[in-house]
């Protein structure tokens, strides 16, 4: 039996760019999620879409007065995944979204969501909130990628945002495949696994825990052209205020298929140590190419 909902109002925050099909797929789930609350708003920051995303979002806002769409032209180019430029850009987008949220009436809870995930368990999110430990400031999703032809093998999604309590900042950028397996193992054992940071496609926040926070890009000392995931410094600030962050096992997100070659699937499933070594080589070559 589901615990009674202790929080009455929610705002769902989304970033959107060229994700029309994902919005069409997840729109009913987002609205169902909001239906568990007495009051809600959905805030979307959209930029530079060319696939009909902008028009779809504005149609959504026309049919639902609780949807707020902030569209703008940014003309940003493709940036290296971990580069300071890309993380700074993502931090700016998330701060713009936070600014839009703060202009609304105060809500109990803020749910940040990657709208391009394949799907998510609505009841899992609600249960994750209603059954959370009293000290929670952020509850992150148990996000998974599925390997093609290996549906029983789950690959942890969004390892870049993950930082365990027994790790320091330096660890967040290295051995991500090994750390992803560690996260998966620990989440399987704990209904709420305490972390310094994670995301997994959905983050649920107490409004009071983030009302004065902002996202930022923090450079790596060893590789100053790269930055930590913008979620990590944001989540560490929540902990500094006396809250606790958790990954909720029940709050499952299906991020879709991990599109890799069959031989890579074999390595990931049966030879993880070899795969980790190849990833290190690949990461080194990738960074060399972006210099």
Q: What is the role of each PLM region?
A:
Residues 22-24, 51-59:
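Acidic helix N-cap motif at the loop->helix transition within catalytic regions
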Residues 9-11, 41, 233:
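Cell-envelope/extracellular polymer assembly enzymes that use nucleotide-activated donors
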Residues 184-291:
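C-terminal catalytic/acceptor-binding lobe
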Residues 105-118:
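Short beta-strand-to-loop acidic/aromatic patch adjacent to the donor-nucleotide binding site
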Residues 117-217:
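Conserved catalytic core of nucleotide-sugar-dependent glycosyltransferases
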Residues 45-55, 74-76:
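A conserved acidic beta->alpha catalytic loop
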Residues 60-107:
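Active-site-proximal specificity loops/subdomain of glycosyltransferases
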Residues 1-32:
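N-proximal low-complexity "stem/linker" segments adjacent to membrane-targeting elements
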């Amino acid at each position: 039996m589901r615990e009674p909902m202790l929080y009455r109002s929610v705002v769902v925050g989304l970033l959107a760019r060229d994700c029309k099909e994902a919005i069409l797929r997840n729109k009913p789930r987002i609205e169902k999620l909001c239906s568990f609350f007495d009051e809600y708003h959905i805030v979307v920051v959209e930029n530079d879409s060319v696939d009909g995303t902008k028009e779809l979002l504005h149609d959504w806002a026309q049919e639902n007065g609780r949807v707020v769409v902030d569209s703008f032209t940014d003309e940003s180019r493709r940036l290296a995944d971990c580069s300071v430029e890309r993380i700074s850009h993502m931090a700016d987008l998330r701060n713009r979204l936070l600014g839009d949220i703060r202009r609304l009436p105060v809500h109990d809870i803020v749910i940040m969501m990657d709208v391009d995930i394949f799907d998510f368990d609505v009841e899992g999110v609600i249960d994750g909130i209603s059954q959370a430990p009293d000290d929670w400031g952020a509850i992150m999703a148990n996000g998974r990628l599925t390997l093609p032809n290996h549906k029983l093998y789950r690959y942890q999604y969004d390892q870049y945002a993950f930082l365990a309590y027994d790790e320091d900042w330096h660890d967040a950028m290295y051995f991500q495949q090994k750390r992803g397996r560690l996260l998966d193992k620990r989440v399987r054992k704990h209904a709420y696994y305490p972390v310094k940071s994670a995301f997994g496609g959905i983050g649920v926040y107490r409004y009071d825990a983030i009302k004065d926070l902002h996202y930022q890009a923090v450079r790596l000392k060893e590789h100053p052209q790269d930055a930590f995931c913008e979620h990590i410094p944001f989540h560490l600030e929540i902990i500094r205020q006396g809250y606790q962050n958790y990954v909720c096992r029940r709050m499952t997100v299906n991020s879709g298929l991990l599109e890799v070659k069959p031989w890579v699937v074999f390595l990931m499933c049966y030879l993880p140590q070899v795969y980790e070594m190849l990833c290190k080589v690949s990461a080194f070559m990738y960074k060399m190419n972006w210099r």
